[in-house]
């Protein structure tokens, strides 16, 4: 990892930006299927399908910001808007429940999360690549990918530990191996208690993610604005 890259102001912003964003994106969002299966009782297949709003948001934001960046020649606003969208998504996900209103909040929240991902990640990669010489493009792209993944690993471990601390001793661990079966527990009182513990534990994760999203917003506002490079590839060498 070329350390001289960290002398560049853009990289000093994009690296922590993608790391903190990755903490939320990979950490908090990994538990959405668990909530859908355990609390709402949907099948694993349907819990995967219910994540489509995230991918729809990613696609819309990625394509939209790409076109707008090309048209306007500036990229600075999109990570800020993406970070705000990510924070809104966390707020809405913290409200999700098995009620109709709670599921609506979750689905809309997933769209905002997707918009946040699409606004932050591709734009940070573009800004970083635009800030370095062509010979460092591969290295700097790897740096961004590494810190995004590192943030995800840390986030997944941290949110997993938080969830465990909330449910340890309150829910039989065997139930978590087949979360959909919780809805089939014959003892109504036990079932409601388990669902309440899981629901409160999972939504707590998104409440914790809200201040992290605010940190992402603050970092995004520090991103320097640089004119986009108007040429592609390495400069040609005259061999005559």
Predicted feature locations:
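Short coil/turn linker and secondary-structure boundary residues
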Residues: 1, 42, 177, 185-189
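Transmembrane-helix exit segments and adjacent C-terminal regions of multi-pass membrane proteins
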Residues: 182-240
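Short, Lys/Arg-enriched, Gly/Pro-containing loop segments at transmembrane-helix junctions
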Residues: 1-4, 169-174, 227-237
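N-proximal short alpha-helices
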Residues: 29, 51, 178, 187-191
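Juxtamembrane non-transmembrane "cap" segments at the membrane-aqueous interface
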Residues: 164-185
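12-transmembrane solute porter fold
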Residues: 1-169, 205-216
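Short, surface-exposed, charge-dense and proline/glycine-enriched linear segments
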Residues: 78-80, 85, 171-172, 186-187, ...
């Amino acid at each position: 990892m070329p350390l001289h890259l960290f002398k560049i102001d853009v990289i000093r912003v994009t690296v922590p930006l993608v790391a903190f964003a990755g903490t939320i994106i990979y950490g908090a969002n990994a538990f959405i299927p668990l909530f859908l299966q355990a609390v709402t009782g949907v099948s694993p297949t349907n819990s995967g399908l219910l994540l489509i709003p995230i991918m729809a948001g990613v696609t819309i934001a990625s394509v939209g910001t790409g076109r707008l960046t090309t048209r306007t020649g500036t990229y600075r606003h999109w990570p800020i808007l993406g970070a705000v969208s990510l924070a809104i998504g966390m707020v809405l996900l913290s409200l999700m429940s098995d009620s109709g209103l709670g599921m609506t909040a979750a689905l809309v929240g997933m769209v905002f999360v997707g918009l946040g991902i699409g606004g932050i990640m591709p734009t940070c990669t573009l800004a970083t690549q635009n800030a370095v010489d062509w010979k460092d493009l591969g290295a700097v792209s790897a740096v961004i990918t590494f810190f995004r993944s590192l943030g995800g690993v840390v986030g997944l471990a941290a949110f997993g530990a938080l969830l465990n601390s909330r449910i340890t001793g309150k829910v039989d661990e065997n139930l978590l191996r087949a979360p959909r079966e919780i809805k089939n527990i014959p003892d109504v009182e036990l079932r409601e208690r388990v669902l309440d513990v899981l629901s409160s534990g999972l939504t707590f994760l998104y409440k914790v993610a809200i201040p992290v999203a605010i940190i992402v917003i603050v970092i995004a506002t520090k991103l320097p604005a640089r004119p986009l490079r108007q040429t592609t590839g390495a400069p040609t060498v005259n061999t005559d």
